[in-house]
């Protein structure tokens, strides 16, 4: 049984085997993704990923409730770019904590955050630990993008060695959802100045500039994005997430 949380009636929810049902909570964001991709890129991808996951699970015996996408996240690193909206870290923490508390109150035992914006990961990880301790439920944190998968890496244009935010992969996925939302003719490529330090330092707002100090807002080159590449990325990512959901089902 796979269903959408918001589409169930109270009586239907009462009949759900809540102790053995996974609630998948997609975490989106509302932030700039360069000149070419919409502010809601992460939220749009989160919704599409849920659709692809549902298709991949059609032949599986699994109880899964898809929670509505949380459309705003922790985007402090993008706050100086026009249109970006962010929670404060503790606001975001308390909002997610309260959702988990409500779900636990109703008897759900298996919760899974589907992180569709990297900036949400630290809070999701913290919530996972706290909720397990406070409510004796099993919270999991899943990453929405199989960006290290060799078949996904193979979609990136030859010579493009960096694709982090608002680049070819994310832009391609949005093109699957609604090609009219992508304005490739306005795209710019860019690599934030501190990429050499990326393994050691968290991304800060000041990192989203070029070496010359120009605000860039993306990491990568979106000009090679295509709908076909987006289909590959969404499909492979959904298949990888499904593997994790099966493990959670059997946990």
Predicted regions and their residues:
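Extended, histidine- and acidic-residue-enriched regions that form the cofactor-binding/catalytic faces
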Residues: 1-110, 118-251
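Short, surface-exposed ligand- or partner-binding patches at beta-edge/loop junctions that are enriched
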Residues: 114
């Amino acid at each position: 049984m796979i269903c959408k949380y918001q589409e169930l009636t109270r009586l239907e929810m009462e009949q759900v085997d809540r102790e053995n049902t996974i609630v998948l909570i997609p975490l989106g964001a509302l932030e700039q993704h360069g000149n070419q991709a919409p502010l809601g890129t992460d939220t749009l991808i989160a919704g599409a990923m849920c659709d692809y996951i549902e298709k991949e699970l059609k032949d599986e015996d699994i109880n899964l409730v898809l929670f509505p996408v949380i459309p705003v996240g922790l985007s402090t690193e993008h706050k100086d770019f026009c249109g970006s909206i962010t929670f404060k870290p503790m606001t975001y923490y308390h909002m997610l904590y309260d959702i988990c508390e409500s779900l636990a109150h109703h008897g759900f035992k298996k919760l899974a955050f589907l992180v569709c914006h990297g900036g949400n990961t630290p809070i999701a990880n913290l919530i996972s630990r706290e909720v397990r301790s406070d409510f004796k439920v099993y919270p999991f944190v899943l990453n929405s993008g199989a960006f290290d998968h060799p078949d996904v890496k193979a979609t990136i244009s030859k010579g493009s060695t960096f694709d982090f935010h608002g680049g070819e992969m994310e832009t391609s996925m949005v093109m699957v959802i609604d090609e009219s939302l992508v304005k490739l003719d306005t795209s710019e490529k860019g690599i934030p100045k501190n990429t050499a330090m990326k393994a050691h330092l968290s991304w800060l707002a000041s990192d989203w500039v070029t070496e010359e100090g120009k605000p860039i807002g993306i990491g990568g080159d979106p000009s090679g994005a295509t709908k076909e590449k987006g289909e590959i990325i969404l499909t492979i990512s959904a298949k990888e997430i499904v593997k994790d959901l099966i493990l959670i089902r059997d946990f």
